[in-house]
C-alpha cells in the first residue's frame, strides 16, 4: 500500500490527466456494457413484434454508444501517454536529485550498476505498468461491477454461477501474486548483476584487450546472463499460470450458464434474447477478471520496482547541512586540526581505518603525507572536505568544526584532487569551468600553465578540444594535470592533492609544485608515494596502520622515524640500481625517486606494501 502511495505522490502535474483518464475509461466501459441490453431488446421486443422502426432506433443507439466509446478511447490514449511518461520523468528526476544529496557513505551501500538499473529498467517497468495497465486497471473493475449489475437485472438465477467462480479465481490470483512477488525482486537484482558486468567491461575494455582476457570476461557475462535468463523463466513461468486457469473458469461458467439457461427457456422462465445478452455479459465479466489478474501481475512487478526506487528516495543522507541559519558561510583561514579523530567506513566494521589522530596544520603551510598502502592517507584528507564524517573526535577547518559549515561553502574552500581522476564528456573548457563557471579564458590558461597543461593543450585541440567518454585520447598524466588545473580555478583556502601526480614525470611534478608554492595563503596537503614530491614541505606526516607515526621535516624524520627511513632507503636503493643499469630504462635512471613509475617497491619494504 505504501508503494502505491509513493507512486501516486509523484504524479504531480499529471494528476488531472490521470483523473480524466479514469473518467474516459469508466464512461466508455458503461457505454459498451449498455450495448448487450440494447441487443437483448432488439431480439426480445423488436424481432417478435416485427417493428422495424424500433429495431432501427435501437441500432442507432448502439452506433451512438460505439462512436462515443471511440472518442473516449482516443481521449484516454492521450491522457495515459502523458501520465506514464510524466510519472517516469518525475521519478527519474527525484531519484537523480536524491543521489546528488547522498554522502559517499550512503553511495557505498549501492553498486553504480544498481542505481543505473533503478533509474532506467525499474522506471521503464513502472511506465509500462501505467501505460499498458491503466486502462484495464480502470476498465476491469468497472466492467466487473456494472456487468454483474446488468447480469442480475437480466436473470438472478444465472448470476449465481459467478458466486462460485469468483472466489475460486480470487484464491488462484492471490496464490500466483504471492509466488511471483519475490521473484520479480530477484529478477531486478539479476538485472543489476548483468548491468554491473557490462558496465565494468565497457569501462575497462582497454585492460581486457591488453591482458587478452576477453574469454574470461565472456565467461563472467555468460554466468550473469544465464542467471538472468533462469530467473526470468521462473518468474514469467509462474506468472502465466493465470491464463489457463482463467480460460478454464470462463469455459466452465459459459457451459454452466448455457445448461441452466437452456432449461429456463424450455420452462418458459427466460427469453432467448435475455440468454444471448447474459452470455455477452459472461464474456465481458470473465474478460474483466482476466484484465484484473493481468493488472495485478503488472502492479506486482511495478510495485517491486517502486520499492527499489523508494529505498534510494528514503535514504537519509549521512552528511547534512546544519539546521536553520546556524551554518557558517566560509572558513576564516586554511588551518586544519584533527582532535582525537577515529574513522571507519561502516558502522559494523571491526576496526577503525583511522585511530585517534591528533594533528594540527597551520594556515598557509605545505604538508606532505606519506604511508603504506591502507595506512589511511586518503581517508584522512576526505574528512577535511567532509566527504565523510569522523566516527569519533572532531575535524576543524579555520578553527571551527567542519560539521558547522554550510556544505557547499566548505567544499568551495577545500579543493581536493581525488586519487581517481574524473573528466566529463565535453570540451576542455567545460571541464575546467567546473572549478569556476565564470572563469575567463585568461584565467583558464593561467591555471593550465600552473598545472603544466599548456605543454599538451594544443595537441588536444586547445580549450575547445573535445574530451570523449572516459577521457579517451588523454593519457593518465594529462588527465591528472587537467584535474589539478580545474581545482586551482576554485582558488580554495585548502588544496589537497591525493597522489595526484603519480602519473607525471619528476620534472613536471617539480614544476607543478613550484607553481603551487606561489599560491598565497593556501594550505597545501600533498599525498605522495615519492619522497621527492614532499621532501621540501614545511612538515611531513607519516601514517602507519591508521595512526600518526611521525611528524617533522625531511631531515627530522630521516634522523628519527624508522618507517620514513625505510621508505627513503628503499627508494634510494632502487635509484642506485637504476643508475647502475640493473634492468631499468634511462628514464628511471634519471629519476632517483621514481619508484612508482618504474615498478619498484612503492613504500619501502614488505611491511608497508
Where are these regions (language model features)?
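Alpha-helical transmembrane segments of multi-pass membrane proteins
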Residues: 17-18, 65-84, 135-142, 163-190, ...
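Pre-NBD coupling/linker segments of ABC/ABC-like ATPases
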Residues: 317-331
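An intracellular "coupling" helix at the cytosolic face of ABC transporter transmembrane type-1 domains
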Residues: 13-16, 101-105, 121-130, 134, ...
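ABC-type nucleotide-binding domain
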Residues: 329-609
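Transmembrane helices of ABC transporter permease
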Residues: 13, 17-30, 34, 41, ...
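Helix-loop-helix
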Residues: 51-57, 146, 150-164, 234-308, ...
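Membrane-integrated ABC transporters
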Residues: 1-32, 39, 47-63, 72, ...
